[in-house]
Amino acid sequence: MSNLRKVVIDGNEIEVDGALTLIQACEEAGIEIPRFCYHERLSIAGNCRMCLVEVVGGPPKPAASCAMQVKDLRPGPEGAPPVIKTNSPMVKKAREGVMEFLLINHPLDCPICDQGGECDLQDQAMAYGVDFSRFREPKRATDDLDLGPLVETHMTRCISCTRCVRFTTEVAGITQMGQTGRGEDSEITSYLGETLDSNLQGNIIDLCPVGALVSKPYAFTARPWELNKTESVDVMDAMGASIRVDTKGREVMRFLPLNHDGVNEEWISDKTRFVWDGLRRQRLDTPYIRENGKLRKATWPEALGKAAEAIKGATSLAGLVGDLAPVEATFALKQLIEGQGGIVECRTDGAKLPSDNRAAYAGTATIDDIDGAEAIMLIGTNPRLEAPVLNARIRKAWTMGANVGVIGEMPDLTYEANHIGADATIIDDLLKRDHSEVAEKPSVIVVGMGALTRSDGAAILAGAQALAEATKSGLLILHTAASRVGALDVGATNPDSMAAIDKADVIYNLGADELEISDGAFVIYQGSHGDRGAHRADVILPGAAYTEEGGLFVNLEGRPQLATRASFAPGEAKENWAILRALSGELDATLPFDSLASLRSAIVKAHPHLGNIDEVAENTGNALAKGKIAKGALTSTVTDFYLTNPIARASQLMAELSANAKARKTEAMAAE
């Protein structure tokens, strides 16, 4: 039986799903309904009353369009479709009244409010309100909350829409915000005055329709109309969240989420949102050469000449690909190093990932598959630290009835999970069981780097792949590096390469700051920040950060995405691919591309699937050879969410958040 229902909205008859609310039906008809409390990704509260519409033939009063479904409408005379009016005199009068009530206690802070220029209350007061107020009584005042270093509160501006409460409870999975009191005495507050303990809390800034919750680090720095807005991709984890980079002059002022149903919906992690101050600190803005044990500033010809001299004289040459390197730079490095007889490696954490089997390193599931899964298994991972937005999607599936199982040490998750066991050998035990019942349900297995960086990582990956095959589950590999899948796609690996790198006498380090390079080798470091890699370098070539050059990144599910340049690199720093092209000229082996466009053409010619931007290819590959899984508990490789890369480690705000997280953990252990 069809669930489609006919309905007449402002004189236009349309056919919609009966389960839709009236506000959704109006959107289907192309009619915008004002709202404050309603949000399509949160539960329905129905408390702002701004979305009132007139239902002809219904009760003689306006109806809240966010809370009434189409199937509940009474048909018209002789079975005619129900009629809805969104712009009748009754509706206009109701909206004016609601707006007047909302503004009764609202302060006239617009000139000094950070929300000014992008405020729903401003826009809707202009569109649906009146130009005078009948209220002559004193306005109420409330104390501001201390929610931590990220969210600044101005609670006199709050209209009690409860979006922040619903987000923290339903999506972030914490219960530290709530509403107390009734009527004029109602207010949003935190539990016992606690600061928020979530790495997704910054999203309540976007959700707040007024200026009650604003960004504390961004406060009073810029107005929305002063900013240049650029669509790009996040690289703080391997999910590849869609983001907007707002810049003022040459500086990045803030990051905001963009809607992408297949990846991040419209949420981003706090590291993604607030790491921008790390782009301003500890930057490499000029080349350096080490002489007599100390680094000195050099010119580009000097630095490139010194690097070329070392490469030409190398008996064993190796290249390392860091966690934030775009595909273009990785592809260029591979051609440069292999052209000089060297090897290139992107698996700098020792992950046992086969570069010739895309189904094994990019998985067979999509992020979107998690939403519909009835069973989810986590192997050697803590998604709350490794990919907070992915963790929110797992929580979303859990709230819809999915069962979550964990193999490995039990992490502190935001949902209930069945701890199957900590030992990796449990995978072998599970393979011996009958999975016919599970195979009938949609399910996803998520494997983390905590499992794959072990010495038996290849055996664990083969076991997880076999388990996915037995249960007819999708396999998702949760990488911790944004560059990893793209680097594997272009073949930036080599058998036994980590052993070869240990023996190399010249190492070209493309932003790999997460490993220690042994003494003795001559190190050429190309990167954006003065982090661990730069401290070990003999030559430093300053490169652009991810907001300062166009770059291709492939996320954990194998989706190619483009990061767009939003600003320019500081000082004499250059785009990463251009540095490698210039160095190839010094080596008399000039790479065959002289622009970013020609480089991308070469990449797509060699790897056609990378030309399908924002599409997830169906990953294929042979079953991996089974190996012996050793005893031992699986643990996550990420222990400090806020300090996982050089940009984050340069951020003062990330350092503060890291210290706060450690203090909370210490307090919790002391309480036990």
List the predicted regions and their residue ranges:
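Structured interaction patches on ligand/partner-binding surfaces of diverse proteins
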Residues: 66-77
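Short acidic beta-strand-loop surface patches of small beta-rich interaction domains
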Residues: 43-47, 52-59
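N-terminal export/assembly segments and adjacent metallocofactor-ligating motifs
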Residues: 2-27, 35, 39, 55-58, ...
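Short, glycine-/polar-rich solvent-exposed loops and beta-turns at beta-strand/coil boundaries
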Residues: 38-47, 69, 182
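Acidic, glycine-enriched active-site microenvironments
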Residues: 8, 51, 66
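Long, low-complexity segments enriched in small/aliphatic residues
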Residues: 597-672
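Non-catalytic alpha/beta scaffold blocks inside enzyme catalytic domains
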Residues: 348-613, 665-672
